[in-house]
């Protein structure tokens, strides 16, 4: 069940076992071992994704292994194509696969998650992604809520 699902009735919950598995370990992702990226590139992607999971965790806006797999796959394809450099591919992958999940009301948790995400993206020199999060922060302040899709 996720935020798009209606809540379950007490009758159903009486018969169910609820297991939460939303908190993932980025380091444990099995795809790191099979990636075609260079070791330094893998380290940069892993550090970026670990930082994003940690920044987004308090607001439960983080992501799972499928997103990690897709980010790696996007960068690998970009490397094969030779059209864009690694840093641009990482920025585009984060923008396309992680940032669309960002949304929320103007609460301390969401403010902190957006601030930490913004700081990380600037530190990692992911300019397009950092600019998008800055827009979301502006929306949060001025509108009381923010979402990737405007």
Regions found by a protein language model. Name each.
Residues 1-150:
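C-terminal regulatory/interaction module of P-loop NTP-utilizing enzymes
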């Amino acid at each position: 069940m996720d935020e798009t699902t209606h809540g379950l009735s007490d009758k159903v919950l009486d018969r169910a076992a609820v297991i939460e598995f939303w908190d993932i370990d980025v380091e444990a992702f099995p795809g790191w071992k099979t990636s075609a990226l260079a070791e330094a590139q893998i380290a940069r992607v892993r550090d970026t994704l670990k930082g994003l999971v940690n920044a987004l965790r308090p607001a439960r806006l983080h992501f799972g292994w499928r997103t990690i797999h897709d980010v790696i796959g996007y960068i690998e394809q970009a490397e094969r194509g030779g059209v864009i450099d690694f840093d641009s591919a990482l920025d585009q992958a984060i923008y396309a696969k992680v940032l669309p999940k960002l949304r929320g009301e103007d609460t301390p948790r969401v403010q902190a998650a957006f601030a930490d995400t913004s700081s990380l993206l600037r530190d990692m020199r992911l300019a397009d992604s950092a600019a998008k999060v800055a827009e979301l922060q502006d929306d949060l302040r001025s509108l009381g809520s923010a979402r990737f899709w405007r």
